[in-house]
Curated annotation (Swiss-Prot):
GO terms for molecular function: inorganic diphosphate phosphatase activity; manganese ion binding. Its cofactor is Mn(2+). It comes from the Bacteria. This is Probable manganese-dependent inorganic pyrophosphatase. The keyword Hydrolase applies. Keywords: Cytoplasm, Hydrolase, Manganese, Metal-binding. It catalyses: diphosphate + H2O = 2 phosphate + H(+).
Length: 310
């Protein structure tokens, strides 16, 4: 068993997944542990902007981890989103802000899960609880994660804690959250030069909801109309994913952070779940739903209820 403890977020990592791993690794190392941040996929343009802005290296891409390797996971607690051989590893901790899912251990672990808008909000709180000041780099990355996950407090997942922690971290990082958010979102929402596969997998998660296997990708944009040229190829890619990976439905949320709503594109034999969950009617595999900003709070719960017949 290696001496190192790897800390990683979920597959198809978003900004919170990457930044939380880096920030929590710094905290654990300051507490005397030997940790290394990792990742389970490519980095998005938004995350790349944050890393470059705060002069941080991308975490190590984790592949083929040996049995009993010590690991801490952040920003998820769902097996389908985690390391492929998680059951062979030695899971030490989980830090997360999502629903309690299906990861199990045969021994007790430290598991901190809170109903806040971002995992970095929890990790930032842990710094302050322990009286440890994060570096400017770690503070900036946690700010980036909170801004990203809460859409700068536009998302309904936002809590008072998110606002409080961001305010403290922004002082350490020496940034104006509004100005920085505008720059980060602008960098992150550009689709120019991307393939449909890159767009879809920039923030994609698989869920087992009741007896259904559902895939949900979310792409933040400032221009939904600009996606039209990608739609045909995107539907072909999503249909292939449904067939190859036995999904009941695959969804893409194109979330407009200015208009505060999402265009939902859906494929698969159970796309009727979208109609039922949101009281809408898909037309040509798509429907715009005002007010939908959060996959976690506004998409997964109604889909679950639709599946369960509630």
């Amino acid at each position: 068993m290696e001496d190192i403890i790897y800390i990683t977020g979920h597959k198809n990592p978003d900004t919170d997944s990457i930044c939380s791993a880096i920030a929590y690794s710094e905290l654990k190392n300051k507490l005397g542990f030997n940790t290394v941040p990792g990742r389970l996929g490519n980095i998005s343009r938004e995350t790349e902007f944050a890393l470059n802005y705060f002069k941080a290296n991308a975490p190590k891409l984790l592949e083929n981890l040996s049995s009993n390797q010590d690991i801490i996971i952040v920003d998820h607690n769902e097996r389908a989103q985690s390391v492929d051989n998680l059951e062979d590893l030695h899971l030490l901790e989980i830090i997360d802000h999502h629903r309690i899912a299906d990861i199990q251990t045969s021994y007790p672990i430290f598991f901190r899960n809170e109903p806040v808008g971002c995992s970095s909000t929890i990790i930032g709180s842990m710094y302050f609880e322990k009286g440890i000041e994060p570096s400017k780099r770690a503070a900036g990355l946690m700010c980036s994660a909170i801004i990203s996950d809460t859409l700068l407090f536009r998302s309904p997942t936002t809590t008072a804690r998110d606002k409080e922690v961001l305010k403290k971290l922004a002082k350490i990082a020496d940034i104006d959250p509004e100005k920085y958010a505008s720059e980060m979102f602008k960098a992150g929402t550009s689709l120019k030069g991307k393939t449909v596969e890159e767009i879809f997998n920039s923030d994609y998660k698989a869920f087992n909801l009741g007896d259904k296997k559902i895939g949900v990708s979310q792409v933040t944009t400032m221009d939904i109309e600009g996606f039209d040229e990608y739609k045909k190829d995107m539907l072909a890619y999503m249909n292939k994913k449904v067939k190859d990976e036995n999904f009941n439905a695959v969804l893409l949320l194109l979330t407009d952070i200015i208009k505060e709503g999402s265009l939902i594109i859906a494929t698969g034999e159970n796309t009727d779940l979208v109609n039922k969950a949101f009281n809408v009617e898909l037309k040509d595999n798509a429907v715009y739903v005002p007010g939908i900003l959060s996959r976690k709070k506004q998409v997964i719960p109604p889909l679950t209820s639709a599946i369960e017949g509630k």
